[in-house]
Amino acid sequence: MSRFILLAALGYICSQAPALAQVTPFAGALGGVATLSADARSLPTSHGLNVSLYKPANGPTLNFIAGVHLNQYLSVQASYGWNRNDLTLSSSSSGSNSFYVEQRSSSQRAVLFDLLVYFRKRDERLRPYLSVGTGVVHFASTRQNQIALNGTPTLPQTRFSSTQPALRVAVGIDVAVTHRLALRYSFGETVRHNDISAQLSPPGERILANFQNLVGFVVRF
């Protein structure tokens, strides 16, 4: 439903573009909290039950943006984002009495391009928006501490990483402080291939979702 509304709004705004065109560049910086999705899987076997899971902790995130307001309602932006999250991975096999628990660090670096659709004109003090974008995200994780180990479980690699395409959707609002300066709040979700789940044994099946609560400032030029 939200996608339909976004597409309908975009179609209307694009039809009005010639009358509204007035390109204005902007840039900004935002920071906040990143929350990763978790995953778990259980797999029955002839010898018992194999279980694996990972639990992420909330971590810091930074986002730097630059773009242009194409008209009163439509903007495009490029962004570079970083976030760090600690992880706890574990796996157990009742048949072989093997298990492990380990702590890991993880980080993501993203380059994304977004289309923003505003619902109020540029001279309004409150300007809510929806956005959708795509790009690439580099994920990396390193083992920090082996908490428990018994038997011969299949362990994740000491370090693993990959660069994958990603999709991001977000909602937010710009609150004008001055004519050129605005406070921006944004809540977004970025999804990509899940390298963490792929390292579990048995492997998890969920995609990796990165939820970000961001607040910062945007300056018009």
PLM segments and residue spans:
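Extracellular loop and loop/strand-boundary signature of outer-membrane beta-barrel proteins
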Residues: 47-53, 96-104, 152-159, 199-205
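Cleavable N-terminal export/targeting peptides
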Residues: 1-23
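Gram-negative (and chloroplast) outer-membrane scaffold detector with strong preference
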Residues: 22-26, 31-37, 65-149, 208-221
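Predominantly the C-terminal beta-signal and adjacent terminal strand-loop region
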Residues: 85-89, 178-221
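Flexible, solvent-exposed coil segments and beta strand-coil junctions
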Residues: 41-47, 87-98, 146-154, 191-197
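Surface-exposed strand-loop-strand hairpins of Gram-negative outer-membrane beta-barrel proteins
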Residues: 34-62, 162
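Residue-level recognition of beta-strand termini and adjacent short loop/turns
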Residues: 71, 176-178
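Short sequence motifs at beta-strands and strand-loop junctions characteristic
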Residues: 54-60, 105-110, 159-166, 205-209
